């Protein structure tokens, strides 16, 4: 499986997240000004669920945000490395660090 074109939408029914894919997406993230890069697994932007592999390199920052659409959940799984996460309530008070 070639990981050379990471920005194209996946057409395979199964994509394995292996070391080669992690390394490739991380390499692109290191060369991006925001120090992060995602690889889409959903077939189109109109798909009801968006599945992404986000490579977030040291020094990157993701601003606090929320999804108002009740069908738009956000799940994070750390596959390697570590990250800091702050969870806020609807009024902006910190719930969890």
Residue ranges and their predicted role:
Residues 1-50:
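A short, N-terminal "cap"/entry segment at the start of jelly-roll beta-barrel domains
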Residues 35, 53-72:
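Conserved short histidine dyad/triad with adjacent acidic residue
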Residues 39, 51-54, 76, 83:
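A broad, low-specificity signal marking well-ordered, structured residues that form hydrophobic/aromatic
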Residues 43, 55, 87:
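Pocket-edge structural micro-motifs
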Residues 43-46, 68, 75:
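Generic marker of residues within folded, mature protein domains
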Residues 46, 90-91:
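Short strand-connecting beta-turns/loops that link adjacent beta-strands
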Residues 71-90:
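Glycine- and acidic-residue-biased ligand/ion/polar-headgroup-sensing regions
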Residues 94-97:
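Short, intrinsically disordered, charge-balanced linker/junction segments flanking boundaries
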